[in-house]
Amino acid sequence: MKTITITNLKGGVGKTTTAINLAHRLASEDKRVLLLDTDHQANLSRFFNAQSERNIYQLFIGKAAPQPYAISDNLHIISSDMETATINFRLIGQMAWHSVLRNKLVSSGFTALYDYCII
């Protein structure tokens, strides 16, 4: 699974729009795409009306395996919520969040199911 991260500290620069367009493009080319909404504002999740209690926060804390929401056959999303804002505090003294995320995706089996992961 190839991972593409779209990030910027400034809000309103098009991160969500870029992720949506890129994901749709890859899915239209028969690629299996997993979108990860890691933003506590959950704009990506709201755009697709994808709210779940088994979300990205649950993946980070290891409480439950997240349940990806199917947008289409080739496009799925793991949603976010306000609790996601506390992840950095929970990971103090551990490895960086991106390393934790990578390890969780591998151990949950997601890397074998998708061609691309867009964060």
For each feature predicted by the language model, list its residue ranges.
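P-loop NTP-binding core
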Residues: M1-I119
